[in-house]
């Protein structure tokens, strides 16, 4: 029977239980995200940055601050139309233009071409240069709307000759002049007194030539197809139109029939078998986009295989839109198969790194993290020789954190490592910090072991982030062990930051004396050189009143020689506060002995101690200290004058400085 496909298409559709693409198919499936439908189409990251939907703008800033626990910030890219306008405003050479666009990951699409032209309405030279370049480089991307937009630019800017030349070109290509262009340009002609051109424009419409514009033809065809059940009568009405079907018309008809994919497919088959039109890459892809829905999954599969069999490629616009639909409807497995298929196409037409990143984000945020799908996506991407960039892992990590699955970051890292990826030091820090801060002790240790096994040790920044994370999680014991492992592997050269975080965490947990033991051990046995600020934190906390009474004062004193040996000036302010408030004369004398490498400190230091005690009305303790001092101090004129001028009846009690509480870095 003629057109046997008709009866098949009218059968009730039943979902096929078989996979999207059988494993016998030599075609794999690719995934380029689609706009929802329009926004996703223009968000391409790599070679087609603005064509991926679900774009979470975002690429993480890869630097980690001195805290090493910072989250990557997402770097926002300029809109593609802004980049294109800038390029064509500056450059003229084709090679220069192409190179510049490629370096900015810009790919021309129908929508992008329209946006660029609309932005350039007041710049006809730049618009004309872009349009001419587009005709040569991407003729299939310039639709009837693009032609009309360029026509309007010529008309409203008074470029009459260029306007009529383009009208003639449009007639040859089957494009009509829109009513909007007629009205806008007609007003311009009238204003400029161009009566002949105005009359010519009116005649163009009066002749009825516009009845064959793409939009008009499309509307007539769609009205016939949608009005009745498909049959011989519908086919007769279509033949009676006596239309010469062109690619743009067929594509537009299929897009408008998107609401009824069955009728779109009937029209698609009929127009080919009736000899009215031979399908090209543009119309094949338009049909595939219409069928790319859950209900028509089998037919979509057959269509994209048919595209390849006919010697054409699945356009990125097709991949992007269909992939977006799959992801929106939670068809993640089908989206991965589509990605595999697309990656098996020509190298110049495969999904970009950004599209791969978007799909990976959808996988890790799905109801259940399917690592098999994650691995398949990476294999499809790296199979073409692509290299996984840091930004891809950054996006995935952010997505894991958003669904509280950061603990599974090791699984993700292992899968990416199989493709040859090694995370940068900054990303190692992000993972290490994230795991330890969440209290994922086992996972944090697993990260260290995995990196070692793969021959890539965590660097000093990442180890510091691990220590800091354990500190933030209040797991001081694990933080201490981690720090010891760190200096055991990396040495003490870059341990200052991590050690200060460790000291601070102990002090804020009121365990200054515990961390003092670790402090002394590491300085004496491991030649650790703490920062000056770390010494200050230790001294302040050991001299807190209760801690000082229980032995903290003596421990704080012992830090003064260490400080001196490391080339730092002694930190004496907390000692002055302590001695003026509650310190004994014996403690004051011990301080004076410890603050210098000589037998006794300078007169100025001694005077400072006496003054602090006398100002706080601690005359008895000051007298005791004086009696313990060397004779040259007891006979010193300045010392005697100080005691004379600050006798009890002349000295007013000054409010002592408050004892330091928790110290922050």
From Swiss-Prot:
Chief localization: mitochondrion
One GO term describing the cellular component: mitochondrion
Keyword Mitochondrion: yes
Entry keywords, A to Z: Mitochondrion, Repeat, Transit peptide
Cell location: Mitochondrion
Gene Ontology biological process terms from the UniProt entry: RNA splicing
PPR repeats: 280-314, 315-349, 352-388, 389-423, 424-458, 459-493, 495-530, 536-570
Residue interval of the organelle targeting sequence: 1-37
Coiled coil: none
Name of a matching Pfam family: PPR
Top-level taxon of origin: Eukaryota
Family statement drawn from the similarity comment of this UniProt entry: Belongs to the PPR family. P subfamily.
NCBIfam families linked: PPR
Protein name: Pentatricopeptide repeat-containing protein At3g02490, mitochondrial
Organism of origin: Arabidopsis thaliana
Species classification: Eukaryota, Viridiplantae, Streptophyta, Embryophyta, Tracheophyta
């Amino acid at each position: 029977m003629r057109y046997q496909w008709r009866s098949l298409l009218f059968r009730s559709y039943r979902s096929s239980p078989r996979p999207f693409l059988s494993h016998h198919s030599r075609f794999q499936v690719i995934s380029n995200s689609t706009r929802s439908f329009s926004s996703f189409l223009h968000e391409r990251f790599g070679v087609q940055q603005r064509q991926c939907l679900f774009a979470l703008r975002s690429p993480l800033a890869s630097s980690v601050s001195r805290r090493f626990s910072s989250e990557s910030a997402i770097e926002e890219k300029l809109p593609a139309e802004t980049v294109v306008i800038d390029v064509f405003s500056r450059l003229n050479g084709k090679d220069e233009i192409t190179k510049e666009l490629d370096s900015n990951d810009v790919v021309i699409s129908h929508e992008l071409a329209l946006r660029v032209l609309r932005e350039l309405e007041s710049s006809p030279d730049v618009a004309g240069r872009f349009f001419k370049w587009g005709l040569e480089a991407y003729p299939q991307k310039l639709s009837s709307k693009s032609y009309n937009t360029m026509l309007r630019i010529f008309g409203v800017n008074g470029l009459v000759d260029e306007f009529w030349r383009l009208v003639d070109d449009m007639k040859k290509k089957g494009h009509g002049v829109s009513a909007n262009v007629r009205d806008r340009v007609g007003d311009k002609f009238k204003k400029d007194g161009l009566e002949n051109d105005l009359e010519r424009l009116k005649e163009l419409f009066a002749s009825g030539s516009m009845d064959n514009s793409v939009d008009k033809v499309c509307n007539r065809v769609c009205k016939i197809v949608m009005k009745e059940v498909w049959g011989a009568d519908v086919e007769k009405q279509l033949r009676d139109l006596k239309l010469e079907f062109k690619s743009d018309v067929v594509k537009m008809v299929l897009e408008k029939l998107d609401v009824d994919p069955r009728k779109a497919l009937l029209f698609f088959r009929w127009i080919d078998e009736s000899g009215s039109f031979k399908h090209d890459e543009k119309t094949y892809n338009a049909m595939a986009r219409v069928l790319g829905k859950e209900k028509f999954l089998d037919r979509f599969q057959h269509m994209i295989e048919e595209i390849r069999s006919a010697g054409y490629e699945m356009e990125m616009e097709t991949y992007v839109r269909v992939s977006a639909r799959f992801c929106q409807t939670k068809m993640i497995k089908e989206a991965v198969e589509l990605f595999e298929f697309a990656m098996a196409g020509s190298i110049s037409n495969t999904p970009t790194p950004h599209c791969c990143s978007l799909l990976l984000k959808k996988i890790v945020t799905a109801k259940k993290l399917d690592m098999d799908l994650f691995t398949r996506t990476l294999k499809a991407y790296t199979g073409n020789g692509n290299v996984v960039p840091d930004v891809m892992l950054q996006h995935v990590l952010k997505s894991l954190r958003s669904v509280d699955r950061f603990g599974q970051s090791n699984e993700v890292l292992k899968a990416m490592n199989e493709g040859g990826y090694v995370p940068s030091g900054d990303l190692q820090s992000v993972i290490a910090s994230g795991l330890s801060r969440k209290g994922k002790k086992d996972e944090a240790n697993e990260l260290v072991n995995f990196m070692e096994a793969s021959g890539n040790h965590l660097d000093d920044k990442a180890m510091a982030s691990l220590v800091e994370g354990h500190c933030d999680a209040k797991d001081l014991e694990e933080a201490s062990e981690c720090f010891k492992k760190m200096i055991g592997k990396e040495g003490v050269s870059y341990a200052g930051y991590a050690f200060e975080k460790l000291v601070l965490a102990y002090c804020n947990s009121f365990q200054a004396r515990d961390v003092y033991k670790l402090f002394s051990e590491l300085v004496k046995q491991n030649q650790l050189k703490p920062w000056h600020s770390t010494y200050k934190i230790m001294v302040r906390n050991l001299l807190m009143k209760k801690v000082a009474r229980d032995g903290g004062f003596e421990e704080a004193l012992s830090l003064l020689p260490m400080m001196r040996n490391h080339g730092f000036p002694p930190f004496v302010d907390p000692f002055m506060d302590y001695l003026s408030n509650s310190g004994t004369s014996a403690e004051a004398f011990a301080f004076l002995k410890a603050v210098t490498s000589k037998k006794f400190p300078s007169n100025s230091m001694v005077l400072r101690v006496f003054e602090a005690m006398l100002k706080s009305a601690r005359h008895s303790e000051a007298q005791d200290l004086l009696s313990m001092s060397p004779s040259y101090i007891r006979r010193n004129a300045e010392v005697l004058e100080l005691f004379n001028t600050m006798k009890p009846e002349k000295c007013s009690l000054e409010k002592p400085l408050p004892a330091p509480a928790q110290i922050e870095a």
